[in-house]
Amino acid sequence: MARFTRWLRRNIDAVLALLISVVVGILALADVLGTEEDQINAAILIVLALLAATLLRDRRSAAQALESASAVRLLSGLEVSQAHAEARHATELWIFKGGTGTYLRAVTLKECIEIARREKRLLRVQLEVIDPTDEALCKAYAQFRSSLAPGPDGTGEEWTLVRTRKESFATILAACWHRQRCASFLTIDVGLSRTMTTFRWDVSSRYVIMTQEDPAAQALMFEKGRPYYDAYNRELVSSFRQAKRVHLDNVGELQLSDEPTIEETRRLFTQLELELPASFSERDITDIVRKALRAKNPYP
């Protein structure tokens, strides 16, 4: 009975057309509707009306299907950077999960902060990058990036274990540096992932942009209010909860200079309980500071 009810609901238009045709035919035989021509015209009009209703319903279904399909946009080449620029506009939120956050430091974080300052809005930032103190994890990430494109990337550097650790440390330093200077409107949290991801997620108040580490690969964009925006948002929140939190409040009274010194940088990571590798020289630390404040765009 339930199956018949579902079938009837799906095919009600055709069923009604059939019933009306049968009824009109019976009435015609009984000579109730007047002349034969009147009977035929009445039947035709009613059936045409039902056919029109059916077409309208199908058109609405097609429109809904098209709208659902447009919920996911494929992006290639310049479309990716254009989508990021659109996402940064008027956003009050930015969630990032990826490798080391090079593009985040070079473009995203600076522009989001500048837009929020100019428009006098609050900005909440959540960052999740790989743990720079996990040597095995950083080595695996460096090997993965090198396998995608051997040789220097858009920054002019090759992916090595040392570079990977520097990039991730630089993201943490950048978060602390901007946090101190924009405390009136910026809230920023940092988590360190214990696993490597081959994707990058960027979430703004309006969009989720999902890219791959390979710049030649297509990206996906999901708009708020459409399927998957909330799902991916929840996914990143859940992932962040499982990440190793960097307690930025532990910085205490340490005030970073406009150009943090080597001593300030060492002290910062000590207070964050993220000791720099003993093998890192002063030149390496200077490089971390440069990457934190003046990172090169890897996708110019």
Language model features: what each stretch is:
Residues 1-80:
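N-terminal alpha-helical membrane-insertion module
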Residues 141-199:
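HKD-type phospholipase D/PLD-like phosphodiesterase module
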Residues 127-139, 149, 160-167, 224-229, ...:
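Low-complexity, flexible helical/coil segments
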Residues 52-147, 277-300:
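PLD-like (HKD) phosphodiesterase/transphosphatidyltransferase domain
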Residues 210, 215-300:
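Signature of lipid phosphatidyltransferase scaffolds
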Residues 187-227:
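HKD (HxKxxxxD) catalytic microenvironment of the phospholipase D
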Residues 2, 6-10, 142-156, 247-273:
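A broadly tuned preference for mixed-charge, low-complexity surface segments
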